[in-house]
């Protein structure tokens, strides 16, 4: 993520920015100097200023003001826009596209995942879609490591012991956790985020990495991380620590369920930084409640927000964070700038920086 913004500007200023600026210059010299070429719907009022400044060069921004974001407002303000800066997890579907109108020609999500977007409908309308993968790999990998350590070494349970004055360290086996050293670490999905996690694991003296993906990663990647592709059942049965780092698809939805948990080690630590519905949460609750697996750490869940009375929150061996994997100033700003460039490039018919297809 070093100098991401500089890289973006190097690749994009000669196309999108120049195009929008030249459009402004030509219009300034005409009688209709106050007219703008494009309208862009910005679905969130807190988009970083860097992205807003970029898009406002020659474009009119139609800002949504509601917090949390409101679908009714989005539908009302979408009318007549040419581009959409989609910074919410609400569905971007046919209704939204119809509300915008036939002039809609560019959409980008300020997210890596696009499971909330009707991709087929966008393709049908020949509208390009951008998103913001890669740039968030580092921040998400960091929180994955935090969840791993917290779940393996029982941080949440330990804090509860302090709060309830239940220190029992006179027992030799009190609060024993799982070590990372010599662990077999599994990855369900081994793309950019998975490999960023693997990079961080190099300092933990793990034994090896196993991964399950649709396609084998490059041999050089396997060599770098001492990684081997295995069938899903082998991943479940052999992993001491298992990271879920795959996209949500019809094939991955609910794949971690009672059948899967029954095949895992009793000392297994499960981490999910991908999408909540990949795990059947009722089955996860049972697996943790009955100590079928040792512990879990999740940054994603279903639904989001998770209700305060959800039974998952009663589990001492589950660490939960509120979907904050990319929540650093640097990463969110970079995501916003990339998203802005995607929208602008799509408007002028140029390839997006991060196209979804």
Language model features by range: what are they?
Residues 25-130, 257:
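An N-terminal-biased, well-structured beta-alpha scaffold segment characteristic
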Residues 33-36, 173-266:
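Rossmann-like dinucleotide/phosphate-binding beta-alpha-beta segment
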Residues 75-79, 97, 101, 180, ...:
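A short, aliphatic-rich alpha-helical micro-motif
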Residues 89, 112, 240, 246-248, ...:
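Short glycine-/small-residue-rich Rossmann-like dinucleotide-binding loops
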Residues 100-105, 125-127, 206-207, 266-268, ...:
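A short helix->loop->beta-strand "cap" motif at the edges of active sites that frequently abuts
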Residues 127, 133-184, 196-199, 204, ...:
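Phosphate-binding beta-alpha-beta segment of Rossmann-like dinucleotide-binding domains, i.e.
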Residues 129-130, 266-357:
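Rossmann-like dinucleotide-binding domain for NAD(H)/NADP(H)
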